[in-house]
């Protein structure tokens, strides 16, 4: 059962049109955009389709408009996940915003999970189950009305303009054949651009959706790097480290104006500091060596300046210290 799906799984490469076709066929809806399912009601019914009786459909609100109402639907979904021991994290704060990319990713996961449970087989009475929900009947009516309007618009489409044979048929009825032919030809040519202009609309919608998804991905990447920079800024504001030269250089780079190249300048500024610290370490080592040599010279000089009596006294002290405690010097 696919509860944990990686971002590189094939589930996240399922297209938007395939997701919409799956939702509409399973739940007998007529969604045109994936983000229309951001209220969470569709997710709850999809779980009900693969786990009948697990979802309390009377708590699901298909007429949810505000974020508060949507969050209640996601609470129902989270309870179902907990009951089924599904560990998938639901990013409610992002889904209720209706952003296309977030809703598409979560719906891709839903499809992968549902297919892993029922193998893609659908034997579900969506209309009957949805009637128990708040706004379920209205959602069914809206879907039916949308489907009916689509059928009527396709059936009532005007016929295409007649061919040039029809134009020739009316030519004998006019005295000024040249004028009538030119006006008919102009009308025929003017109708072509309008027909061409009405065709690319779905293509533009598809392109707009792709651009929205791309913008969402860029925003997520921007937020990721901004959080990293914010962590660096918090670290630089630590009282224990903010006085360090390196931290000061990092701050100047963070707060530099747009177009201001401070990276190279800060690198040159830090180089003498590093060299100076190395020189200080070397000088300390040399001074310690010199001090040790001076101390040795002083000790040798002190020994050489002793008188013969002091040397004999020192020698007798040594002998006494090495003899028995009962002996006296």
UniProtKB/Swiss-Prot annotation:
Residue spans of biased composition, Low complexity class: 174-185
Keyword Thylakoid attached: no
Region (Disordered): 130-203
Subcellular location, principal: nucleus
Name of the protein described by the UniProt record: Microtubule-associated protein RP/EB family member 1C
PROSITE patterns: CH (PS50021), EB1_C (PS51230)
Family stated for the protein in its record: Belongs to the MAPRE family.
Free-text note on domains in this protein's UniProt record: Composed of two functionally independent domains. The N-terminal domain forms a hydrophobic cleft involved in microtubule binding and the C-terminal is involved in protein binding. In Arabidopsis thaliana, EB1A and EB1B possess an acidic C-terminal tail that has autoinhibitory function, but EB1C has a tail region with patches of basic amino acid residues required for nuclear targeting.
GO molecular function per UniProt: microtubule binding
Amino acid composition bias (Basic and acidic residues), ranges on this chain: 130-141
Mutant phenotype after disruption: No visible phenotype under normal growth conditions, but seedlings show increased sensitivity to oryzalin, a microtubule-destabilizing agent. conditions.
One of the Pfam families matching this protein, by short name: CH
EB1 C-terminal domain boundaries: 193-263
Organ and tissue specificity: Highly expressed in the root and shoot meristems, in guard cells of leaf stomata, pollen grains and pollen tubes.
Organism of origin: Arabidopsis thaliana
Gene Ontology BP annotations: cell division; cortical cytoskeleton organization; thigmotropism
Keywords: Cell cycle, Cell division, Cytoplasm, Cytoskeleton, Microtubule, Mitosis, Nucleus
Additional information: Plant microtubules behave differently from those of other eukaryotes in mitosis: they lack centrosomes and spindles are barrel-shaped with unfocused poles and no astral microtubules.
One cellular component term from this protein's GO annotations in UniProt: microtubule
Region (Required for nuclear localization): 289-311
Quaternary state and interactors: Homodimer.
Designated gene of the protein: EB1C
Described function: Plant-specific EB1 subtype that functions preferentially at early stages of plant mitosis by regulating spindle positioning and chromosome segregation. Accumulates in the prophase nucleus and is required to maintain spindle bipolarity during premetaphase and/or metaphase and for efficient segregation of chromosomes at anaphase. May play a role in the dynamics of microtubule network in elongating pollen tubes.
